[in-house]
């Protein structure tokens, strides 16, 4: 299973962890993914999805 949001397509972001002395080490900022059941009106059933918390937030705002 890939570490990608099935709704928005979000993936991990490459960045740097910067110390006090400004030494930079590479860091992977992962997406906060959650397993969630979402109602699909087209299929008339619950669908299990792996979606980001940002997508969950927008889904609850639209309902």
Swiss-Prot record:
GO biological process: translation
Source domain of life: Eukaryota
Principal cellular location given in the protein's record: plastid
Gene Ontology molecular functions: structural constituent of ribosome
UniProt keyword terms in alphabetical order: Chloroplast, Plastid, Ribonucleoprotein, Ribosomal protein
GO cellular component: chloroplast; ribonucleoprotein complex; ribosome
Compartments in which it is found: Plastid, Chloroplast
NCBIfam families given in the database record: L28
Family note: Belongs to the bacterial ribosomal protein bL28 family.
Protein name: Large ribosomal subunit protein bL28c
Annotated organism of origin: Pyropia yezoensis
């Amino acid at each position: 299973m890939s570490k990608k949001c099935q709704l928005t397509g979000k993936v991990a972001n490459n960045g740097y962890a910067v110390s006090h002395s400004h030494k930079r080490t590479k860091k992977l900022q992962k997406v906060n993914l959650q397993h969630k059941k979402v109602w699909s009106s087209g299929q008339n059933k619950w669908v299990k999805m792996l979606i980001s918390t940002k997508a969950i937030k927008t889904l609850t705002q639209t309902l």
